């Protein structure tokens, strides 16, 4: 009888212990899942800054996160770097016979430390880029067209550069002349939006034909949401903007203009010739007869010059007729960075490092290789060669036209080009 009671007591105690264990376990798991549910841009706690909080208030609460998040993220990254450096001595093997043995076994401690340092550096650069963007979007003394409007004020037709991948929770705003062809290829593979000749989704970005990459039917973009969701389209956009990881890649604005001119006016392109070269030649050249075809124009050497192209951009009549083409339209008009809080800002100047970091943060770095691209054939060092031939007044007007892109994305003002 005593043994029976003892057995029952042990069973009861064991049951209580298991219940407590399950409660504690699921409480921890639930908390972890809750913390991991948000995008990586909101994963770190922050301290506030009075000056930046005032700036954020001026943005009329456009962003989901506030400056506190950015500041403390920046501080936490600095702290992580200090902690990493303080523990290096513990990680490094002692020199002597033991280090010889470990070298023989293939250990490379310095490589690991360099990788950790590089990742921290890249993360800090990201925080700096996002903080710079947030500061100027909230700076009431810095203005540019469309800055003060809300996301709801953006016309549907201007949301056509925001590509959505629902399978992985990603939104990419593509900017022409900034590696967008390869990023579009990646988005097609991730979203499985295009089938190959065998009827299966493409798995290798490089196998996707170029004409399909730029076909609008290959991508789900925000401007198509009204077809799916009708009157709920804006609500669905806001949900995805809040929950998905949003990124874009940018480039020095003046270098981007050179690249656009070279690809659209120094190569034979019949569509661009009729849509843009003919109007430019008609308005800004002394040509008595504009060639009918691009082939005839190249043969006779009557294609627009870079100077005439800049005149076309500066002429108010140009946008009175229709908006800038996407290849030279300002990034703030394509991607609306003061209305959309981007989680990642990449730059063409650091494309390799930024792409590697982004794919790693998205947990996509093991799925595929980012397509290799031609070495940046339009170099930043070309700026002076191309722009110094323009009148100083034109250069100043052009900078004013693209000033928002320079400032928002942290590109230095080209003072050498803007001084007499």
Swiss-Prot record:
Transmembrane segments: 6-26
Annotated catalysed reactions: chondroitin beta-D-glucuronate + n 3'-phosphoadenylyl sulfate = chondroitin 4'-sulfate + n adenosine 3',5'-bisphosphate + n H(+)
GO cellular component terms attached to this protein's record: Golgi membrane
E.C. number(s) listed in UniProt: 2.8.2.5
Any Pfam family hit: Sulfotransfer_2
GO BP field: carbohydrate biosynthetic process; proteoglycan biosynthetic process
Binding site for 3'-phosphoadenylyl sulfate: 176-182, 251-259
Family to which this protein belongs: Belongs to the sulfotransferase 2 family.
Function: Catalyzes the transfer of sulfate to position 4 of the N-acetylgalactosamine (GalNAc) residue of chondroitin and desulfated dermatan sulfate. Chondroitin sulfate constitutes the predominant proteoglycan present in cartilage and is distributed on the surfaces of many cells and extracellular matrices.
UniProt name for this protein: Carbohydrate sulfotransferase 12
Source organism per UniProt: Xenopus laevis
The organism's taxonomic lineage, starting at the top: Eukaryota, Metazoa, Chordata, Craniata, Vertebrata
């Amino acid at each position: 009888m005593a043994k029976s009671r003892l057995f029952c007591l042990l069973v009861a105690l064991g049951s209580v212990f298991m219940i407590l264990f399950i409660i504690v376990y699921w409480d921890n798991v639930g908390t972890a899942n809750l913390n991991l549910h948000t995008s990586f841009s909101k994963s770190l706690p922050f301290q506030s800054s009075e000056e930046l909080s005032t700036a954020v208030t001026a943005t009329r609460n456009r962003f989901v996160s506030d400056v506190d998040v950015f500041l403390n993220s920046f501080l936490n990254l600095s702290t992580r770097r200090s902690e990493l450096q303080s523990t290096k001595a513990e990680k490094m093997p002692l020199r002597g016979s033991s280090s010889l043995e470990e070298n023989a076994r293939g250990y490379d401690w310095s490589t690991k430390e360099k990788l950790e340092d590089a990742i921290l550096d890249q993360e800090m650069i990201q925080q700096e880029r996002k903080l710079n963007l947030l500061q100027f979007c909230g700076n009431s003394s810095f203005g540019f067209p469309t800055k003060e409007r809300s996301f709801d004020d953006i016309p549907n037709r201007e949301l056509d550069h925001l590509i959505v991948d629902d399978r992985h929770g990603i939104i990419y705003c593509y900017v022409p002349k900034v590696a967008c062809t390869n990023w579009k290829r990646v988005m097609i593979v991730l979203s499985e939006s295009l089938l190959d000749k065998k009827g299966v989704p493409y798995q290798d970005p490089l196998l996707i034909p170029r004409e399909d990459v730029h076909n609008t039917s290959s991508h789900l973009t925000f401007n198509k949401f009204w077809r799916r969701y009708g009157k709920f389209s804006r609500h669905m956009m806001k949900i995805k903007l809040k929950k998905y990881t949003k990124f874009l890649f940018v480039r020095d604005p003046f270098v981007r203009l050179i690249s656009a001119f070279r690809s659209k006016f120094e190569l034979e392109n019949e569509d661009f010739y009729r849509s843009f070269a003919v109007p430019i030649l008609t308005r800004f050249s002394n040509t008595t007869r504009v060639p009918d075809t691009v082939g005839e124009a190249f043969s006779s050497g009557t294609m627009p010059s870079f100077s005439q192209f800049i005149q076309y951009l500066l002429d108010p009549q140009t946008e009175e007729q229709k908006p800038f083409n996407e290849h030279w339209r300002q990034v703030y008009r394509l991607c609306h960075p003061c209305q959309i809080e981007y989680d990642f800002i990449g730059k063409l100047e650091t494309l390799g490092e930024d792409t590697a970091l982004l794919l790693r943060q998205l947990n996509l770095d093991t799925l595929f290789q980012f397509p290799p691209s031609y070495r940046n054939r339009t170099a930043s060092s070309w700026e002076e060669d191309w722009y110094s031939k323009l009148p100083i007044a034109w250069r100043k007007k052009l900078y004013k036209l693209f000033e928002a892109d320079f400032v928002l994305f942290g590109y230095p003002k080209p003072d050498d080009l803007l001084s007499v």
